[in-house]
Amino acid sequence: MTLSDDTPGPLLASGRAADVFDIGGGKVLRRYRALHDGVTYETRVMRFMFEQFRAGRGVHVPEVFDLRPADDSGRDIVMERIDGVTMLNDLEQRPWKLFSHASLLARVQRQVNDVVAPEWMVTPTTAAATKRRDDSVLHLDLHPMNVMMTAAGPVVIDWTNASGGPAGFDAALTFVEIRTFEVSGLSNQLGLRLFAAAFKRARGSGEIDAFAAAACDHRLADARITPGERANVGALRKQVRVRKSGRTRPQN
């Protein structure tokens, strides 16, 4: 098998837009299913964050490796294989870790946001009207499925949406994503609400409330969310609007 094959190795994971294959030698291939003009940017972000991690800042991210020109399809990223389970998988096996994992997610996100965004990193208009010199690195998709739990500690994956901006926006978007994920079953729905509330307390309610409306708008602008998630975000957006008018107390 070669990197140009449709199936370059055993399939390890599948997301909404990409698949991850084991290509041996401690490496994996992340392949987008369609031509993706953000691959170069995502690779640059990951390399930047990996260098920050090696310098003692930020969080552990997979190391990215060069592709040969002949293998570069515009859809692929070759990176270090991370052995472990996602935080979500760990929660499914050990639900009693809910509160400690929510606190860990908040701590990991702070470590991401402690890194100052370089000038070349984009800033979404939903996060801020203009770019600032002291903007933080924002992951903008940091939830339990994008944190790998390993023997060496948490590793953050999937940097597709990474940007620069105010740290509170990243925190609010994580809260909105977790709070509005589409899941079946009353126990799963209750678990999500508990996790979202615990994350909000650990990350800072005031910071999240300040950016909650913008985070909802950012999420609603994402064409990839499911109809159920769109309905959930819309309902949360209405709650935020009511809360801002002062007619009710903050919602967890």
Predicted region positions:
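Helix-rich C-terminal or lid/interface subdomains of diverse kinases
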Residues: 84, 104, 173-252
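Active-site acidic catalytic loop and adjacent metal/ATP-binding pocket
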Residues: 19-22, 120-121, 126-169
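Conserved structural core of kinase catalytic domains
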Residues: 65-107, 128-129
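Conserved HxN/HPN-centered segment at the entrance to the catalytic loop
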Residues: 50-67
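ATP-binding glycine-rich loop module of kinase domains
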Residues: 9-42
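Conserved kinase catalytic-core helix
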Residues: 55, 88-124, 138-140, 145, ...
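AlphaC helix (C-helix) of the protein kinase catalytic domain N-lobe
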Residues: 42, 46-49, 109, 174
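Juxta-kinase regulatory segment immediately upstream of eukaryotic protein kinase catalytic domains
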Residues: 1-7
